[in-house]
Amino acid sequence: MIERGKFRSLTLINWNGFFARTFDLDELVTTLSGGNGAGKSTTMAAFVTALIPDLTLLHFRNTTEAGATSGSRDKGLHGKLKAGVCYSMLDTINSRHQRVVVGVRLQQVAGRDRKVDIKPFAIQGLPMSVQPTQLVTETLNERQARVLPLNELKDKLEAMEGVQFKQFNSITDYHSLMFDLGIIARRLRSASDRSKFYRLIEASLYGGISSAITRSLRDYLLPENSGVRKAFQDMEAALRENRMTLEAIRVTQSDRDLFKHLISEATNYVAADYMRHANERRVHLDKALEFRRELHTSRKQLAAEQYKHVDMARELAEHNGAEGDLEADYQAASDHLNLVQTALRQQEKIERYEADLDELQIRLEEQNEVVAEAIERQEENEARAEAAELEVDELKSQLADYQQALDVQQTRAIQYNQAIAALNRAKELCHLPDLTADSAAEWLETFQAKELEATEKMLSLEQKMSMAQTAHSQFEQAYQLVVAINGPLARNEAWDVARELLREGVDQRHLAEQVQPLRMRLSELEQRLREQQEAERLLADFCKRQGKNFDIDELEALHQELEARIASLSDSVSNAREERMALRQEQEQLQSRIQSLMQRAPVWLAAQNSLNQLSEQCGEEFTSSQDVTEFLQQLLEREREAIVERDEVGARKNAVDEEIERLSQPGGSEDQRLNALAERFGGVLLSEIYDDVSLEDAPYFSALYGPSRHAIVVPDLSQVTEHLEGLTDCPEDLYLIEGDPQSFDDSVFSVDELEKAVVVKIADRQWRYSRFPEVPLFGRAARESRIESLHAEREVLSERFATLSFDVQKTQRLHQAFSRFIGSHLAVAFESDPEAEIRQLNSRRVELERALSNHENDNQQQRIQFEQAKEGVTALNRILPRLNLLADDSLADRVDEIRERLDEAQEAARFVQQFGNQLAKLEPIVSVLQSDPEQFEQLKEDYAYSQQMQRDARQQAFALTEVVQRRAHFSYSDSAEMLSGNSDLNEKLRERLEQAEAERTRAREALRGHAAQLNQYNQVLASLKSSYDTKKELLNDLQRELQDIGVRADSGAEERARIRRDELHAQLSNNRSRRNQLEKALTFCEAEMDNLTRKLRKLERDYFEMREQVVTAKAGWCAVMRMVKDNGVERRLHRRELAYLSADDLRSMSDKALGALRLAVADNEHLRDVLRMSEDPKRPERKIQFFVAVYQHLRERIRQDIIRTDDPVEAIEQMEIELSRLTEELTSREQKLAISSRSVANIIRKTIQREQNRIRMLNQGLQNVSFGQVNSVRLNVNVRETHAMLLDVLSEQHEQHQDLFNSNRLTFSEALAKLYQRLNPQIDMGQRTPQTIGEELLDYRNYLEMEVEVNRGSDGWLRAESGALSTGEAIGTGMSILVMVVQSWEDESRRLRGKDISPCRLLFLDEAARLDARSIATLFELCERLQMQLIIAAPENISPEKGTTYKLVRKVFQNTEHVHVVGLRGFAPQLPETLPGSDEAPSQAS
């Protein structure tokens, strides 16, 4: 037998009147006796404070305040304490014989509110020898002690071995420890529980019975039946969750298309934009690279154009310079042609004038002949006149010189005179004044030489005179010819000039004969020179074009090299054309192949996506279509196996559900018919009687009753007989046992207990051996244990069934997916990767484009080289035939030489043409020019002068000779005086002189007459000469003009000049044409350069913009990619098949999806705002944010208990798998969970019956309690009429109200409330909701009305009311009810506490003087029977016979108030025994 825990003592430390007082508590009744103010209430207040340290509940008021709602300001606690640390401790010993000290530390808090600080604590393991006062006080001396604060107490206890000190921060923890150690009867989990406990203590403290206590008895006595309520709540929660899940499934099913539409459109909207940006980024990169390539190409082209422009500008400058020269040359040639034409006209004039001159020449010659004859006659006349003159002069000379001396003296005198005269004459003749006879010899030699010279000259003149005399008539003609040829000249120069002219004429005729050959030679040479110059120009141009200077010797080798190069380049160009055609053809084939692959790529990608999904779903890798078909066969086999296993698990789960349902029946009845039969027979099921049997005893009782464990216990079997007749609705074996259901025991059988078995002796000749079942089902604990294990098994089976169902659905879906894959994609799924091939082909295409570009460049270079080589060969073909000309360095000199010779020859020809006739005429008569007839007189005079000079020289020589010879005569000076003259000879000479003078006069007259005629002839000659001279001057002027013109006016000159002009005009035209071509090409080149410059600027701008855009887009794209990867949506957005769509298609796709999304998210403000923000084309990351928001929204919409994934797409894929299975499963679960209204009514009724039976059992303990006229006390439990009607309708007429219970919109509680309102329309439900009302209706306590009844005197059983009972009767009745409550709490909490603990029982009773002695004795008896402790506060005149009594007397000693305590145990005739410590002297705090 388990001993009940007891309170051993109460210790008060530093309370008002109690410094350190320990009250030992009696095992039954402890009485505090004393007068008013003795400290009885303070003591019980200290006990209650230690028991319930909750300041919100503690309210110690006097009994006069019993009905007050508020007491003193401090609720009676602050005034019961003294300043400083105070303690209230309870020393207990529990059923395990463990000593536990619990208490509180109290301390007043200064302030107007008069608050008290409370700290609960507990001490375990304290030795029995240690008193509580020793723990919390410290003795200072014999009369002084100090109260230890809590921290010192803690340190003190921690120093004691085996002692545990616990300080609590919450009252719940404090009460939890007290409940676990068996100090209090009920676990006080909340403030409500503490309030109930305090109200119980308070009711016992102040005693009496009230309507408040009566109303709250249901809360105190009737257990909450949390299991049933929780079952209902769990059922409703499960049903609610089930219905919510079904509703969510239905919403999900209805939203599935919306989900699909939303995720599809969101994916299309974002993925299209994502792939468009990806494509655009790739396009932009390609464009940037293309721009860069074009930029480099354009720069190269611009540089080439600039070089070309420079070359063309240089060539244009050369052509401009050459054009100026050619224009000058052409102008010069034109001028030359004009000059030639002018010269030809001049030549014609010259020829006309020459003809006129020839005619005038003839006339002039005739006139000259006439004049010559006249001149001859005139000369004859002059000769005669001159002869006459000479004769006169001779005579005069002779007259002067004639003297002779006849004798020697005279001779010597004459010789001397002659010598002197000779000397004087020699001096005079020789003009030598200093001449002497001695120097004469020397001068003689000199004058002899002069004489010799004069003689030779005289002889020459003499010859001339002789010739002149013979050709006197032809001289004028020859002279005129010489003058006509040579021009005016001295007549004496005519002979020399004529001879020179004749020699020159011969040369000129010879030269003139060479004009035509020279002209032909010059024309040939000039042609060769022009060809040489053209060849040099071609060579220079060729060298310039070749960029290298070549020697003439290298040209032939270069020609051969160029011919070979042309042949090779021609072959290369031909091969290049073929190669280019092959490359083009391959490129077109590649392009066609790429196009076909690009068309096939989306289909292949779709097939690959499907294949990858299948691979991910099944975890297999498929390399061929055969693998797919083989796996499909395996999948079918796996599906069959999974279906078989699922059906097996489902069958087992159904069996478990049925067993759980059977075991969950109220009262342990496994057959519903037994409940009906028990109710019909007025009995109770045996399983219901043993419903509270423990789990350990369940196997024994199960084996004890065996098959009759489902028997019905009836009070009288005889009354059941009539009900058995015609009974068909019952089990095959129905056991009936006679007995009192309220006091049934197992004494009906004779039992022998064996090891894990029993032998039941049913009769003398019938025994039954029953082993203890391994899984007992007898009793609620066993059933609950079994149900718990079945629930665990059911959870495993449900999970396995769900897993298998999901696997089956997944396998079926996978089978369908494989079937769709085989039907749609199997043909292309295992083909080669078109994208890889596209990449290879693109790489090959790039190589081909590069090869084509290189080939084009090489071909262009080869073409340029070919053209250059052809031009070089063409130029060389024009140059090579002229190599000899290029090698002829002397050609120009020869041309100049020939031109000079031609000029000379032409001059000679013109001379011969002009003077040929004159020279022909002059040649026969040139000799006549040796003496000029007009100078005959002069010649004669010259001759005479020559003679004279000869004579003078001779005379001088003679005179000198004479002087030299007469050197001896100078000695005859004496003889000179003797000289005398003779005048006779002079006279004769004078006469002859006169005759000669007369003759001279006549000759002169004849001369004058003939001179006049000669003058006339000369005048005619002068007129002819004047005309001739005029013509001659004009001819000379024309010839000078012709010479000034400087051209050769021959017959081919005009043609050559015209040819030369035409050649120059052709060259000028060619030059101008080339210049125009160059100007046009230069303009085109400049335009091309401008275009290239603009293009280059545009390309640079586009390139830098594109580069900046690429860099900017790269940052944005990195943010987008980071966001995509962080949120794990790359697989959803990077749809490779979209890469093959154009930007317009993707934009159209995104716009269409945007329109659909606007409608789809119109009702969702968040998504609508995010979608609106995502429409910004400059912020692509916002579309990703929208996509993530859609995913998040869908994740939130997806129930994780339905779909176990965070990916909405996978959720949608799993949704279709799960929805049908979940719908079916949840529907069946709802049917299983949904308890019937009849079952609810039976549960509530059975619970009510059980509690009524329990109350009846509690009432048995109160049958012998009496107070005054109260003979007995009992609790009467009745079902309320309205609720009874509800139960009847639920059990009998539930089919009429199935509209409420079958509604999916109403929970069971709400349906129950609606039914209650329907049955009781007169009841006002107030503001309570149907759910709240339904939950109250599911609590059986609300069905019951509990009343306290007393059997009082002759009135019989009456309702216990304070007005009908005396104070003592009311106190006794209330105490009885409180004892019942405590016992009920213990029974209720028995399963929550250890089985080896029986809690302490203690109640209070203040002012017990209101009870008489009999009532007090009854309380003593009740306490003894119920093992309950009671603390009573009684006045001094109460002296109980049993228990312990403390007499308290409050005294004042030296202004200090204290309570004097004396304890007595057992007030009987024997001497009172003084309790230990009763004589303790009053003490004061130090």
Swiss-Prot record:
GO cellular component terms, A-Z: cytoplasm; nucleoid
Signal sequence, start to end: none
InterPro entries on file: MukB (IPR012090), MukB/SMC (IPR050308), MukB_hinge (IPR032520), MukB_hinge_sf (IPR042501), MukB_N_dom (IPR007406), P-loop_NTPase (IPR027417)
Subcellular location: Cytoplasm, Nucleoid
Coiled coil feature spans: 326-418, 444-480, 509-603, 835-923, 977-1115, 1209-1266
Region ranges (Flexible hinge): 666-783
Binding site for ATP: G34, G35, N36, G37, A38, G39, K40, S41
The entry's keywords: ATP-binding, Cell cycle, Cell division, Chromosome partition, Coiled coil, Cytoplasm, DNA condensation, DNA-binding, Nucleotide-binding
Keyword match Signal: no
Domain of life: Bacteria
GO biological process terms on file: cell division; chromosome condensation; chromosome segregation; DNA replication
GO molecular function: ATP binding; DNA binding
Quaternary organization: Homodimerization via its hinge domain. Binds to DNA via its C-terminal region. Interacts, and probably forms a ternary complex, with MukE and MukF via its C-terminal region. The complex formation is stimulated by calcium or magnesium. Interacts with tubulin-related protein FtsZ.
Family per record: Belongs to the SMC family. MukB subfamily.
Main function: Plays a central role in chromosome condensation, segregation and cell cycle progression. Functions as a homodimer, which is essential for chromosome partition. Involved in negative DNA supercoiling in vivo, and by this means organize and compact chromosomes. May achieve or facilitate chromosome segregation by condensation DNA from both sides of a centrally located replisome during cell division.
HAMAP family found in the cross-reference section: MukB
Domain remark from Swiss-Prot or TrEMBL: The hinge domain, which separates the large intramolecular coiled coil regions, allows the homodimerization, forming a V-shaped homodimer.
Protein name: Chromosome partition protein MukB
